[in-house]
From Swiss-Prot:
One of its GO terms (molecular function) is prosaposin receptor activity. This is Prosaposin receptor GPR37. Forms a complex with PRKN, STUB1 and HSP70. The amount of STUB1 in the complex increases during ER stress. STUB1 promotes the dissociation of HSP70 from PRKN, thus facilitating PRKN-mediated GPR37 ubiquitination. Interacts with PACRG. Its main location: other. It comes from Mus musculus. Residues 274-286, 344-366, 452-480, 540-600 are cytoplasmic.
Amino acid sequence: MPARGAPLSRTSRLLLLLLFKVSVSAALSFVPEPRNGTCLGESCSPLIQRRSRDARGPGNSAKDALRVHVPREKLEAEVRGATSWDLPPPRGGDTGVIEEAAAAGPLGPPTKPPSAWRWKSAQGKEPSGHLRRRDPTDPQLFFPTSEGGEMSSKRDGIPQSRQEHSVKTEPRDLFYWPRRTGQLQDSQHRPSAVHEGRTLAPPGRALPQNGSADDWVPDQGGPRRGNTTRRVRLKNPFYPLTQESYGAYAVMCLSVVIFGTGIIGNLAVMCIVCHNYYMRSISNSLLANLAFWDFLIIFFCLPLVIFHELTKKWLLEDFSCKIVPYIEVASLGVTTFTLCALCIDRFRAATNVQMYYEMIENCSSTTAKLAVIWVGALLLALPEVVLRQLSKEDLGFSGQAPAERCVIKISPDLPDTIYVLALTYDGARLWWYFGCYFCLPTLFTITCSLVTARKIRKAEKASTRGNKRQIHLESQMNCTVVALTILYGFCIIPENICNIVTAYMATGVSQQTMDLLNIISQFLLFFKSCVTPVLLFCLCRPFSRAFMECCCCCCEECIQKSSTVTSDDNDNEYTTELELSPFSTIRREMSTFASVGTHC
């Protein structure tokens, strides 16, 4: 028979067991969730996912490294087609990205990233044309790389090398939040809603590690593209002292000598012919016309060419690239036709000396001959304007302006007729240049001078004593024309050699050799324009006497020392010489004129 307290003890024991089970179940049900972010999919709340990403840094979780990738083409198509932050996530991607985008709103990503940001290029390739590299206000895309990423990868149990390998092999599956440039990374300002969507970050740019987006620096791993905020500066050719700087000093000194001598000499020739009544013949007018073009070459083209040679930049850019070759080729045409006209004029004088010097040509005849020379030279040089194009080449130095070259290249934007004519001229330019500007003046002048010299020798044998001095001056003038032709041919040979090398041996010749040939041909052209008046003063006594008279009239000492009797004798002697000069059109009956011409 059970005791009286047995039911009570059994009931109390059952209550204790029930209470123990309830307490154990309650204790097990209130265990907190782990904070290492191991929950997957929608089982994790947005708050836990956000907190986990803030602790590890975005893009460094184990799920990102183990993500199943979709094809790149489809992924890029989704990126380009997206117009807002609400984009469908990639297959197997993290759903927390979309919730984070919704929390951030349409104005941009959450501010204050946990680490520094830098550019990341996607396999060294440029993105498609939706991003413009040159506009600093375009959206720029970043992703974090810092020490926090290494620690988060260790906490997730994924080695850093494996994580970097996954990023390097498949970089196009990483999508980053766009940010506008010009804002500090720790700033609370949010980007404008104009730039929306996700885009791959373009290569070739990098931000400094201080987080400033204002001072751009070129990426170490790729070529420089687009404009930078660094001011490009011209190359200083004179400092520091190197072999190139010594060459720059030599070029500058030589150009100063050519410039000064050419300007003074050609101005003197034009002044003598224009201010001296007895020197206004057809031959002297042709020489004054030649002096004008030589003056134009030295005054306008020489400074531009020297500036380009020293700084590798054209001063007036595309205009100077087109106008300098045009003026140079037109000057060659003027020299060619002038030498041919001088040879014809000398042949007429040698055929009948007495009739030639009794014949006076009026101003309209001289103007017509000069107009034919000008129009022919300008029209033949016109295709040079169409062929020349300005090209820029990077020197490979940081902060240096790109080198500019004036190359022969036909623009495809020309009309069809002009384009066909330019192609035809380009194909025949080598032999046209060689035949018209080298063979024509040299061969024609040498042939005509030989015939003229033969006529002069025959006239000298049959002449009287009074005509021998005139024939001697004709022979002197003939030698002057031959000397001018030899000088012209010597200075034009390097230009033809440069054209032949460019046409047939351009692949086997370095760019430095081509530049050297080009600058030599340019300097020889300037040298020809400089030496022509000097040669004229040395070989032609009337020009030298007129030049000395022009110089002495500016000196008071010469005027004070000259007496009336001496000046009358000198004027009579000078007038007699001018009558016999081949440069003069004075009649023999006009020997009573005492004055030589107007003063300077």
